[in-house]
């Protein structure tokens, strides 16, 4: 290997194959911190995103499961169990906070300042919004309000650049619209805003689908499908307030089961 940077990238790939995502994060943090003026390559950027997405995703899933059990025990009046669950949930929340703080510090200190291309700026600002949103999912009171406000600022900054400089079919622009709409729906409880944003992004992409290059066709159409899935889910919720199905977020990999779809990339 010609440099420690290349070696850490290779180690990150090995860690990904071995599903050792905490170590993958460590290797990619080293890469990011060695880049003072240059940007990360697209491959490096994606590796960093995948590493953090997996590390945070496992804890987010754990938190949702524990919170669901807590609600059931509360409804049954099992106060002793509820007390134990609250302590255990607090342990998971400490881990979530540490992970989010780690990537947010890296974004503010290295990644956002060195981003010169519009694509990179949108990618990192979207990522910043995502991890503030993850904090808003479990924080309460003033901390939740602060996390939600930081999410909104990051997503809006990313959106301004995306609308000006990225095509409607660009997977990063689509992923931003997907996650921004999830934020409106889940965190701000604004289903109308969520549906409006998702529908506009989908419609604009559809109108330019014939301009889509082969290299991004798969990513873009996958996110468009997730946008459509969420619109279907949200419109049915608005109509009958049934709820219960999973919203989709943008992710490099398949969306998690049982939640709105969102993207990690």
UniProtKB/Swiss-Prot annotation:
InterPro entries: 14-3-3, 14-3-3_CS, 14-3-3_dom_sf, 14-3-3_domain. Keywords: Cytoplasm, Nucleus, Phosphoprotein. The modification Phosphothreonine is found at residue 211. Residues 242-265 are annotated as: Disordered. SUPFAM superfamilies: 14-3-3 protein. SMART domains: 14_3_3 (SM00101). GO terms for cellular component: cytosol; Golgi apparatus; nucleus; plasma membrane; plasmodesma. Its main location: nucleus. Residues 245-265 have a biased composition (Basic and acidic residues). It is found in: Nucleus; Cytoplasm. Component of the SERK1 signaling complex, composed of KAPP, CDC48A, GRF6 or GRF7, SERK1, SERK2, SERK3/BAK1 and BRI1. Interacts with DREB1A and DREB1B in the nucleus. Interacts with CINV1. This is 14-3-3-like protein GF14 nu. The lineage of its organism: Eukaryota, Viridiplantae, Streptophyta, Embryophyta, Tracheophyta.
